[in-house]
Amino acid sequence: MLLSQNVSAIGPLNLYPMVHISLVFGISYVVPDLSDESCTLKMRFRNFQSILSWELKNRSIVPTHYTLWYTIMSKPEDMKVVKDCINITRSFCDLTDVWVNRTDMYISQVVGYRENAVVVSCMGSFFLASDKPLDPPKFEIVDFTNNISVNVKFRLDSPRIPSEELQFYLAFIEEHAGNSVKRHQPQITGNITENFNYVIDKLIPNTNYCISVYFEPKDPRKINRSPLKCILFRPRRESESSEPATIGGILILFLLAAVCISTVMILKRIGYICLRNDFPEALNFYKLSVWVFPELPPLEKMATVEVIHITRKKKEWNYNYDDESDIENEVAPRVNSGGYTKHGLTGRLCPTSTTAASLEDCSLEDCSLEDCSDPSAEEPYLPEPKRDAETPAAPGPGPWQSEGTGGGYQTRGTLWQDPTSEEDSDSTEGSEGRIVFNVNLNSVCVRALEDDKDSEVTLMSPSPPEETAVLEEDLSETESSLLVASEEGTQLPFTDPSMECLRPQDALSDKSDTSESDVDIGDGYIVRQVNLKNFN
């Protein structure tokens, strides 16, 4: 704030009493106006420089040049001219190096000349401690991570002012944050250098702060504040805050994607997009929804299964090839102690003198006895027309055997012709009185009856010792059950199944002479060829 003082020209002798009063009471003395007020004197203190300026009241009188005089009131001295302010054309003068004592009162006189004539003369008195306000210094503010630094600058050519006096003038740094104002009073000790730094901390992030620096004089009404300098305080720099910005961007993108997907799915559900079931692949989010919300696996289908055990009775066959009757003569099965059942097989031999018709009738009669129900027997067995002897019934396995292992029958006793017999069909010697059948060596025991009645039973397959004992016990019983084929035809019984083998008897009668030859065809079977002589 500038101080203006109206001065008038007075004599040096009249100033001494006023100087004494000014020093005692410490007040500024205003020199009484002893002449007409032709100009106004002003003292300024800018950047530690004392500038005295003047302004003319009567603008019609314009001096061409000025000269400045001064004296100290406490010293009985005459007026002295200021060397740098003689015959100057400007309306101010720098008294920084002239007025150095701040406790003295200085009396100044400005004289204006036009050519060599004095046209204006003005006087004034100033007490530097109170009448010279200080202009605010230059400063800068810098923001850091958590504070603000205020850098106050002083000129190198500053006046020679002691540090104690500078502490008196350097007052406050004001901090403006919104509507609040906070003053900081720095503590200065020692000599003052070019710059002075002051740190302001405990700041609120993302807040705009304004700083002002000024010197406070004794009169509060004369404070001259500097212009405000503002800065936005950020606790972190932009480089450090890049990571939160990235995370925020990712979250925003994720939310936008979720909103878009949910919108499309809702439009699909309500049928707004399209009304067909085969959607394009771009709009098919079923798999994506399964990944986010997995569905429970479907329940297993269960059905009740009822197991029904069917008990089937074994069909017993009584093969009877009698000419007089086609009815099966059932023979009561004999149950052995081992739980097996004996079955007899009635075999019929074709007559000696046979013709093609008689042989055909014989084969048809055999088929009628068997009901021709065996699916494996595709063609009926037709005996060769040159056979002269009746073929005796050959023993075969019982009906409990699933495989067709019967001697001359297929599965249920039907005779079948071995390929080997077809090869020998051209020879009259091998085709007469011969029957071809298979024997399972794993389950059949064969006893061949030769001319000697004392021949022993020959076992064709091994059997355990227990089964051999049972075989010997039932030997007599088996021999009694064997029947010899006669003209009417007899029944050839099977052996006991508990023996796990069959013992066929090949002796048909005393008049029949048999010769046997066996051929192994693999799979545990043997082809037996029996040569039969013609019966009388």
From Swiss-Prot:
Region feature 3 X 5 AA tandem repeats of S-L-E-D-C, mapped onto this chain: 358-372
Which cysteines link up through disulfide bonds? C39-C122, C85-C93, C210-C230
| Glycosites | N58, N87, N101, N147, N191
Segments spanning the bilayer are 247-267
Where does the entry say this protein is expressed, by tissue? Answer: Expressed in the endometrium. Expressed in all tissues examined except conceptus at day 15 of pregnancy.
Residue ranges of the region described as Mediates interaction with STAT2 (and required for the recruitment of USP18): 432-456
Instruction: Name the Gene Ontology biological process terms.
Output: defense response to virus; response to interferon-alpha; response to interferon-beta; type I interferon-mediated signaling pathway
What SUPFAM superfamilies does this protein map onto?
A: Fibronectin type III (SSF49265)
Tell me the leader sequence span.
1-26
Q: What is this protein called?
A: Interferon alpha/beta receptor 2
> Per the similarity annotation, which family is this?
Belongs to the type II cytokine receptor family.
Keywords of the record:
Cell membrane, Disulfide bond, Glycoprotein, Membrane, Phosphoprotein, Receptor, Repeat, Signal, Transmembrane, Transmembrane helix
Q: Which InterPro entries match?
A: FN3_dom (IPR003961), FN3_sf (IPR036116), Ig-like_fold (IPR013783), Interferon/interleukin_rcp_dom (IPR015373), Type-II_Cytokine-TF_Rcpt (IPR050650)
Which spans of this chain does UniProt mark as sequence repeats? Answer: 358-362, 363-367, 368-372
| UniProt keyword Transmembrane helix, yes or no | yes
The molecular function GO annotations come to: interleukin-22 receptor activity; type I interferon receptor activity
Q: What does this protein do?
A: Together with IFNAR1, forms the heterodimeric receptor for type I interferons (including interferons alpha, beta, epsilon, omega and kappa). Type I interferon binding activates the JAK-STAT signaling cascade, resulting in transcriptional activation or repression of interferon-regulated genes that encode the effectors of the interferon response. Mechanistically, type I interferon-binding brings the IFNAR1 and IFNAR2 subunits into close proximity with one another, driving their associated Janus kinases (JAKs) (TYK2 bound to IFNAR1 and JAK1 bound to IFNAR2) to cross-phosphorylate one another.
Where in the sequence is Phosphoserine found? S480
What is this entry's stated membrane topology?
A: Single-pass type I membrane protein
Q: Which residues lie within the region annotated Disordered?
A: 369-434, 487-522
The residue spans the entry assigns to the Cytoplasmic side of the membrane are as follows: 268-536
Any Pfam family the entry gives: Interfer-bind
Q: Which residues carry this modification: Phosphotyrosine?
A: Y340, Y525
Q: How is it modified after translation?
A: Phosphorylated on tyrosine residues upon interferon binding. Phosphorylation at Tyr-340 or Tyr-525 are sufficient to mediate interferon dependent activation of STAT1, STAT2 and STAT3 leading to antiproliferative effects on many different cell types.
